[in-house]
Amino acid sequence: MASILISGAAGVSIPLVGTLLPLNGGLMRGAKAFAAGVILATGFVHMLSGGSKALSDPCLPEFPWKMFPFPEFFAMVAALLTLLADFMITGYYERKQEKMMNQSVESLGTQVSVMSDPGLESGFLRDQEDGGALHIVGMRAHAEHHRHSLSMGAEGFEALSKRSGVSGHGHGHSHGHGDVGLDSGVRHVVVSQILEMGIVSHSIIIGISLGVSHSPCTIRPLLLALSFHQFFEGFALGGCVAEARLTPRGSAMMAFFFAITTPIGVAVGTAIASSYNSYSVAALVAEGVLDSLSAGILVYMALVDLIAADFLSKKMSVDFRVQVVSYCFLFLGAGMMSALAIWA
């Protein structure tokens, strides 16, 4: 159990630590492609095949389990539900971040106008026609102008940005690529959360299966294979969490939660080993359904949110070297994870 815990923790930690180091951009793209291949192979080769094996077991009754391809059906349902959850969660985060950004821009715009507009005196605009009457500058009108302008009082903004902790580069970027940056950040957060949900459910099943096993001849090779299995899955998940750029506490919690799920499953399996029958109808159905659902989640995430998002991007299409490296790492990750199915 310790080897699985260490392997999972090491795998998920490497990408998180890598974000703190000045690594080559091509290497990072290769690592992302490798992780996508690992997740794709996990869904197809490990989870879907495991679900099919459990739900086609001879111990299950003929009706309804032999009358319909339930593993593939559950995987399809999971993929469609993941699409729906993906859409809803992304929309929630986008609305939340856009609201916070608008509030920040309005507040920032008002302060910039106070500092940089020569017609302002102590935060007020003197109206010559009204004989010196004072009018407060309209915050919303200025903010709207602020959103659609790429340059506005550089000296005043730089002075303000230093005091407010907003860098000039970040501000300029939000104007030029605000929607793209917002969407990209939200997508990475959603992907990391849904991906962990799919991986964790599978890890618990693996742990319980290992915990209820009584044969040392079976456990030893399985333990080694599962250690590599957890390492590769952790590496893939860690890469997605690193891209989400969560707070250090949030990243650590996701990594910790992944690392302990399989050992917890092992502990549960060991505790119920005396009364657990892995060939009972309830156990086979639970294992088959959960594996099939997890397969649908991971296949969707791998193809839609990881492979399509990167391999169909503009950056990939204009750089042949990056294309070659990414495809090689994608096939390598899928191949290595698939090979583990020989033992686990």
Swiss-Prot record:
Residues 22-30, 94-188, 243-251, 313-323 are cytoplasmic. Keywords: Cell membrane, Ion transport, Membrane, Transmembrane, Transmembrane helix, Transport, Zinc, Zinc transport. The keyword Zinc applies. Its main location: membrane. It comes from the Eukaryota. GO terms for cellular component: plasma membrane. The chain crosses the membrane at residues 1-21, 31-51, 73-93, 189-209, 222-242, 252-272, 292-312, 324-344. One of its GO terms (molecular function) is zinc ion transmembrane transporter activity. It is a multi-pass membrane protein. Signal peptide: none annotated. It is found in: Cell membrane. Induction: In shoots and roots by zinc starvation. Residues 52-72, 210-221, 273-291 are extracellular. GO terms for biological process: response to zinc ion; zinc ion transmembrane transport. Belongs to the ZIP transporter (TC 2.A.5) family. Zinc transporter involved in zinc uptake in roots. Targeted by BZIP19 transcription factor in response to zinc-deficient conditions. PANTHER family: ZINC TRANSPORTER 9, ZINC/IRON TRANSPORTER. This is Zinc transporter 9. The gene is ZIP9.
